[in-house]
A protein has these predicted regions:
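Divalent metal-dependent phosphate-bond-processing catalytic cores, especially two-metal-ion Mg2+/Mn2+ enzymes
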Residues: 1-24, 35, 63, 81-116
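His-Asp-centered metal-binding catalytic motifs of divalent-metal-dependent phosphohydrolases/nucleases
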Residues: 26-44, 49-53, 57, 74-83, ...
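Inter-helical turn/loop segments and adjacent helix faces that build the functional surface
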Residues: 61-68
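Short, well-structured alpha-helical segments
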Residues: 5, 9-12, 30, 69-80
Length: 116
């Protein structure tokens, strides 16, 4: 569980920094980073976790009343696409993918980084 927290908070922080550098909304990047593996850590199942995480967090984000429909769409799209490292998506998608990769590399230096 501690590794999950470290990964999620690290991905959120890294996504925010990358977003600032690239001119992408850093707040949305950080929220995306914090929630990107929601279903994976909730259920322990890795398969389809990106899409399932996006579906699961959509009503949670809406219920807060803090985000517009467009912002929720951007966050959930980035989350849904973060495991698809082979295809280039929209800027927020790419920020999250890169932050996720960096965190995996920083957390586990004994394995190779996911291919980008």
């Amino acid at each position: 569980r501690q590794k999950a927290y470290i990964h999620l908070f690290g991905t959120a922080q890294t996504a925010g920094l990358i977003a600032l550098r690239r001119g992408v909304n850093a707040e949305l990047a950080q929220i995306s980073g914090l929630l990107h593996d929601y279903r994976k850590y909730l259920t322990g199942v890795d398969e389809k976790h990106a899409e399932e995480s996006a579906d699961a967090v959509m009503p949670i984000l809406a219920k807060t009343g803090l985000f517009s429909v467009c912002e929720i769409g951007n966050i959930t799209r980035a989350i849904a696409n973060h495991s698809d490292k082979e295809n280039v998506g929209l800027p927020l998608d790419e920020v999250l993918k890169d932050a996720d990769i960096l965190q995996h590399v920083l957390q586990n230096t004994t394995c190779a980084a996911p291919k980008r």
